[in-house]
């Protein structure tokens, strides 16, 4: 059981990491980042159930990561919306907002 959950977590992490590196769209990159967070949450819960069955530290930490990821997604989508309104594009390679 633990092997299947860890393989699923590693598979989701690799898909998210590959998508984050190769993505040229900001929304797709944000979705891949959320996929990475979910893979990490699966590993937290799996290791918590395997090593410490009495205390639920992994589940509590996983819930806090979900809350932080939801806030990150809301802020990220609002920033993407503002950039889209100004530049009419969400492609990452077209932006040089940090350059003078």
From Swiss-Prot:
GO terms for molecular function: oxidoreductase activity, acting on NAD(P)H, quinone or similar compound as acceptor; quinone binding. NDH is composed of at least 16 different subunits, 5 of which are encoded in the nucleus. GO terms for biological process: ATP synthesis coupled electron transport; photosynthesis, light reaction. Keywords: Chloroplast, Membrane, NAD, NADP, Plastid, Plastoquinone, Quinone, Thylakoid, Translocase, Transmembrane, Transmembrane helix, Transport. The keyword NADP applies. Pfam families: Oxidored_q2 (PF00420). It comes from Angiopteris evecta (Mule's foot fern). It is a multi-pass membrane protein. NDH shuttles electrons from NAD(P)H:plastoquinone, via FMN and iron-sulfur (Fe-S) centers, to quinones in the photosynthetic chain and possibly in a chloroplast respiratory chain. The immediate electron acceptor for the enzyme in this species is believed to be plastoquinone. Couples the redox reaction to proton translocation, and thus conserves the redox energy in a proton gradient. This is NAD(P)H-quinone oxidoreductase subunit 4L, chloroplastic. It comes from the Eukaryota. It catalyses: a plastoquinone + NADH + (n+1) H(+)(in) = a plastoquinol + NAD(+) + n H(+)(out); a plastoquinone + NADPH + (n+1) H(+)(in) = a plastoquinol + NADP(+) + n H(+)(out). GO terms for cellular component: chloroplast thylakoid membrane; NADH dehydrogenase complex. Its EC number is 7.1.1.-. Belongs to the complex I subunit 4L family. It is found in: Plastid, Chloroplast thylakoid membrane. The chain crosses the membrane at residues 1-21, 29-49, 63-83.
């Amino acid at each position: 059981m633990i092997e299947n959950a860890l393989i699923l977590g590693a598979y989701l992490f690799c898909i998210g990491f590959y998508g984050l590196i190769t993505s040229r769209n900001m929304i797709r990159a944000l979705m891949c980042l959320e996929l990475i967070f979910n893979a990490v949450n699966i590993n937290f819960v799996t290791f918590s159930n395997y090593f410490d069955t009495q205390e639920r530290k992994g589940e509590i930490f996983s819930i806090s990561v979900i809350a932080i990821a939801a806030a990150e997604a809301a802020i990220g989508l609002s920033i993407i919306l503002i950039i889209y309104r100004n530049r009419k594009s969400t492609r990452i390679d077209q932006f040089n907002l940090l350059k003078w």
